[in-house]
Amino acid sequence: MDLETIRKVDPEAAKAIEQELDRQQFTLELIASENIASPAVMAAQGSVMTNKYAEGYPGHRYYGGCEFVDVAENLARDRAKELFQADYANVQPHSGSQANMGVYFALLEPGDTVLGMDLSHGGHLTHGSPVSFSGRIFNFIHYGVKEKTGTIDYDQLRSLAKEHKPKLIVAGASAYPRIIDFPELEKIARETGAYLMVDMAHIAGLVAAGEHPSPLPYADVVTTTTHKTLRGPRGGMILSNKGFGKKLSSQIFPGIQGGPLMHVIAAKAVAFKEALTPEFKAYQQQVVKNAACLAKRLMDNGVDLVSGGTDNHMMLLNLSNLDITGKEAEGLVEQAGITVNKNTIPFDKNGPAVTSGIRVGTPTITSRGMKEPEMELIADCLANVLKNPQDQALIESTRAKVKDLCQSFPIYA
């Protein structure tokens, strides 16, 4: 990382970057949506591709001099199609939210009815939250999980679809630890005449490696981010096998975006090449093994998990029986060198600013090379701190353990 060049021009910015690197190096990152991009991915993002405007698509640009950015975008598209067995890939969305927006504008009209997962049950802001553009422009009806099991209530989903006749059903989540039944969702969509869109932002890396069923054979359109489990640059992508390519492309450009971020697209190409390797598949297998081990050890320590465990890379801790809120827990474990995020749990009695849960995931710590023995240690540290929030000596000793662990598994070593 070339901090010296930045330091010569802007020491304040360089210091912030250096401090962030230090934070990442010496804390345990358990936020499920975060990961560690490779040096190659970061180098591509910092390349001369950032200098080039390239409105349009490869072979059909509104600017000259695009022959080499065309190569980069075609590499990204072709590799994405190979990775996910898709006929169509659009790698231009700046984010997962904009990928979702592009799909909505391609398939819907303002005011159309859409069925999406409730944010408080594990959905996402762009799945119809009233504070999001999605909830303001479209008429979202929400389905959720069963209170007893914490798993998606497909009977409720089918009933709501039959009652409201949505034009689109949105599946996928930001805080759901179980495998999603895509064949059942497709069946419900076909029964009710709806399109099916799957937002696989959280599980894309698992899907690419065969560690989670793929939505591509079932959904009309699939969206994703390119970071999270996919371990690429921050960005979005749209995939489809159902012939919607022309509509989707026109709604990204010129519909909601102008010039694509060619340096990020080049980094996406690099990340997708990495994702096509056996090493990436082994990494994703370890992500899932680590999550299962971490979940089991937490439950052995008396920590309640929503749905009783995990099938993917994340778990949702229900802190109700520990007499601590999600907000308090987030701050508490951060003192011990562990980063998590507060998160609502299904049927939460606290609001989203406080919450009764925290979300935990294994992508970043697995990228550092940690395996099951480290998961047991991390679970013990996390559970001990959560159960003894007033024990400052315990917090300090845990922070020391965390620092030792991080030094044994450095990032960018």
UniProtKB/Swiss-Prot annotation:
The record marks 227 as: Plays an important role in substrate specificity. Gene3D superfamilies: Aspartate Aminotransferase, domain 1, Type I PLP-dependent aspartate aminotransferase-like (Major domain). PROSITE patterns: SHMT (PS00096). SUPFAM superfamilies: PLP-dependent transferases. It is found in: Cytoplasm. It catalyses: (6R)-5,10-methylene-5,6,7,8-tetrahydrofolate + glycine + H2O = (6S)-5,6,7,8-tetrahydrofolate + L-serine. It comes from the Bacteria. GO terms for biological process: glycine biosynthetic process from serine; tetrahydrofolate interconversion. Pathway: One-carbon metabolism; tetrahydrofolate interconversion; Amino-acid biosynthesis; glycine biosynthesis; glycine from L-serine: step 1/1. Keywords: Amino-acid biosynthesis, Cytoplasm, One-carbon metabolism, Pyridoxal phosphate, Transferase. Catalyzes the reversible interconversion of serine and glycine with tetrahydrofolate (THF) serving as the one-carbon carrier. This reaction serves as the major source of one-carbon groups required for the biosynthesis of purines, thymidylate, methionine, and other important biomolecules. Also exhibits THF-independent aldolase activity toward beta-hydroxyamino acids, producing glycine and aldehydes, via a retro-aldol mechanism. Homodimer. This is Serine hydroxymethyltransferase. The gene is glyA.
